[in-house]
Amino acid sequence: LSAPTSACYDGAVKVVLTGATGFIGGAIARRLLDRGDELTVLVRDASAASALAARGATVTVGSLLDPNAIARASRGADVLVHAAGIPSPRASARALRWTLVAGTENVLSAARHAGLERVVTISSADVTLANVDRVHWDEKRDLAQLPIGERARALRLAEEIALSTSDAELAVTAIRPGWVWGPGDLSTLPELVREARSGGIRMFGDGRNLVATTYVETLADAVIAAARAPGAPGQVYYVGDPEFLELREFLQVLSRTLTLPGPRSGPPFALAYPLAVVRAGRGGATLPEEILRRARSTLFDVQKAIAELDFRATITVDEGMKRLATWVSELGGLEAMLAQARPLPDDATLEREASAAGA
């Protein structure tokens, strides 16, 4: 499908952003403001976006479950970037479906209603999560079955809905990052810190499997490139760091950066995974998808993003770790970061938002 001709922008762009007070959305918001783009953010709590407002962003209060609020925020914009999501597979299945699937449907409906020409949505490499190594996989490689885990399946459905919506009037692009890490992470990183303090971040086996990582500012830059690229509509792109690391290498560097105990070897995958499958659904048990993400090798081919988005990751893991350490220090250290850790969304809150929106 061809893109609307005005979807390729040379100057400042008017962008509406969901998830701007979160980890990934926050990085995208800062990048857009650094560039001088005109930014409107849709947030549930205006006070959480005060720093963005101070930098010139327009703050609109509304829920992802309210397509009318999204449409109001989107009027006059060129691009909508959908970065709201749930990073943890431990959220309830209902919360995952409401936020990831229904939220994406609402964003797309609102964007079309508001007359936008382009949407860029953040998907995940987990849409192909399975009990297989995914080494040198590109966007053409797919699973013969649904991915493993409620979150992965919800992400997969949301991505399919988004890409099937793309047409000559509303161009939709999906970005698939790997393990997203870096400054601003108040969801996954606090959990890793607690785990490290309990004896080290656990691996399954010796951690010699490859791990596909994506520094958060690299992801933000890829999103901006996708919003401007003429060949992006209706396409999906893997985005990752410029280095290929084994899990143990990445966790060693992360632990050292945060002055935490190093990662620890755990039971072999051949034992841990079947046990997790049997125990799935029991409170507190390690989820099968959590083991897959840490034990199976992942290395995604990013040549399509290089060729079609003119985007190439340049921030090294070492540089990203330095920025992560600076952010933690500016927060006041690990204890201050842990105090700000974000809880998982609960069903009751989402139901209230849906009811208020008439969903």
What are these regions (language model features)?
Residues 15-35:
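N-terminal Rossmann NAD(P)H-binding glycine-rich loop of SDR-like oxidoreductase domains
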Residues 47-53, 57-102, 106, 110:
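NAD(P)H-binding glycine-rich loop region in Rossmannoid oxidoreductase-like domains
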Residues 92, 143-146, 194-214, 218:
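A conserved pocket-lining segment of Rossmann-fold NAD(P)-dependent short-chain dehydrogenase/reductase
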Residues 97-104, 108, 120, 151-155, ...:
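Short alpha-helix in the Rossmann-fold core of NAD(P)-dependent oxidoreductases
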Residues 105-150:
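Conserved Rossmann-fold NAD(P)-dependent oxidoreductase catalytic core, especially the SDR/UDP-sugar
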Residues 133-180, 201-204:
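Catalytic helix-loop patch of NAD(P)-dependent Rossmann-fold dehydrogenases
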Residues 153-157, 185-190, 205-227, 234-238:
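Substrate-positioning beta->alpha
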Residues 225-286, 302, 321-325, 332-345, ...:
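Mid/C-terminal beta-alpha module of Rossmann-like enzyme folds, strongest
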